[in-house]
UniProtKB/Swiss-Prot annotation:
Role: May be involved in a redox-related process.
InterPro entries: Selenoprotein_Rdx-typ, SelWTH-like, Thioredoxin-like_sf
Cross-link for Cysteinyl-selenocysteine (Cys-Sec), residue positions: 41-44
Keyword Acetylation in annotation: yes
NCBIfam families assigned: CXXU_selWTH
Residues modified to N6-acetyllysine: 20
Keywords: Acetylation, Redox-active center, Selenocysteine
Keyword Cell membrane: no
Name of this protein: Selenoprotein H
Family affiliation: Belongs to the SelWTH family.
An annotated GO cellular component: Golgi apparatus
Length: 122
């Protein structure tokens, strides 16, 4: 006999993912401008230090562009930079989720992200 519960767990995971997408869309609701979101893991201070350095570089390069750090609960081991547009679409500037070990591969050079941001804004 097949073990029970697998189907329900898979459905729950899909529902949770859909809810997360909806929350991200709703958090951007009423947003009238383009925003940069940095999601980083909170398990280690290295993630936070790199997120702060990246956020500072983005603010220096585009001062009119708001930068949000961890607007929702971050995923474990994540370091992502996303550009949220007013129309609800998003563009991934950097993802370090599948990178590493070593951990330093998860973090981009700030200049790389700034160049990627310029591509999407122009």
């Amino acid at each position: 006999m097949a073990p029970r519960g697998r189907k329900r767990k898979a459905e729950a995971a899909m529902v949770a993912a859909a809810e997360k997408q909806e929350r991200l869309a709703n958090s951007g609701e009423g947003m009238e401008e383009t925003t940069v979101v940095i999601e980083h893991c909170t398990s280690u201070r290295v993630y936070g230090x790199n997120a702060a350095a990246l956020s500072q570089a983005l603010r220096l390069e585009a001062p009119e562009l708001p930068v949000k750090v961890n607007p929702t609960k971050p995923r474990r081991g994540s370091f992502e930079v996303t550009l949220l547009r007013p129309d609800g679409s998003s563009a991934e500037l950097w993802t370090g989720i599948k990178k590493g070990p070593p951990r330093k591969l998860k973090f981009p050079e700030p200049q790389e992200v700034v160049e990627e941001l310029k591509k999407y804004l122009s």
